[in-house]
A protein has these predicted regions:
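A generic local structural motif
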Residues: 4-6, 61, 147
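Sec-dependent bacterial lipoprotein signal peptides
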Residues: 1-27
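Bacterial Sec signal peptide processing site at the extreme N-terminus
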Residues: 19-41
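Mature, soluble, non-transmembrane domains
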Residues: 26-28, 50-52, 83, 87, ...
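Short linear interaction motif-like sites in intrinsically disordered regions of transcription factors
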Residues: 10-12, 41, 56
Length: 184
């Protein structure tokens, strides 16, 4: 009886240690440096694009709608057939994922948001602290954060190509010129 109880306590201790280790794994994932900014401005902003993402042997193609009213920037992704893929918001400090479909559960949204903002948001790089450096060569911007090369952005007409060197993934952003208008 005492031996059985001792074995249970050892098992519980191992289980607790494993749970603590696993919960710590999330904090070991790299954070998207260069995303948060204390200079985030309240403004009205709207943009619509078609995105193609190549990540981890997966390929996603979707429409992305960005809309900011005040401090909160919302991003909504729809499949080309209209299915909602994910919805998130960014307030200058945090990315809050509100909804996402199962195949996108592991997509590194902090990096995706950061890279989209560097590529499309007006003057986003200027909102960053001095640890962010941008080197321009021809049509390509190289983004360095804490002296580490993290992102390449190539502008070609209405197409922007992103190459994230940290995660890694590639993204092509094509601007939609026939914008959907909202009436209120």
């Amino acid at each position: 009886m005492v031996l059985n109880l001792q074995a249970k306590w050892q098992w519980m201790g191992l289980l607790l240690a494993a749970l603590l280790c696993c919960s710590g794994c999330q904090s070991l994932l790299p954070k998207a440096q260069g995303l948060t900014t204390t200079a985030w401005l309240a403004q009205d902003y709207q943009r619509q694009d078609q995105l193609e993402v190549q990540w981890n042997k997966h390929s996603f193609s979707f429409l992305l709608y960005q809309q900011q009213q005040g401090q909160k920037l919302d991003m909504l992704a729809l499949s080309l057939t209209g299915q909602q893929l994910f919805k998130l918001s960014f307030d200058g400090q945090n990315v809050q994922v509100e909804q996402r479909i199962e195949p996108m559960k592991l997509l590194p949204f902090e990096f995706v948001v950061r890279d989209i903002l560097y590529a499309t948001y007006p003057n986003f790089a200027q909102l960053q602290p001095q640890n962010v450096q941008i080197k321009n060569v021809a049509q390509t911007q190289s983004i360095f954060i804490n002296q580490q090369h993290v992102l390449n952005i190539k502008h070609q007409d209405a197409v922007i190509e992103l190459d994230n060197l940290q995660v890694p993934y590639q993204m092509v952003i094509s601007a939609l010129h026939d914008r959907l208008e909202t009436t209120e």
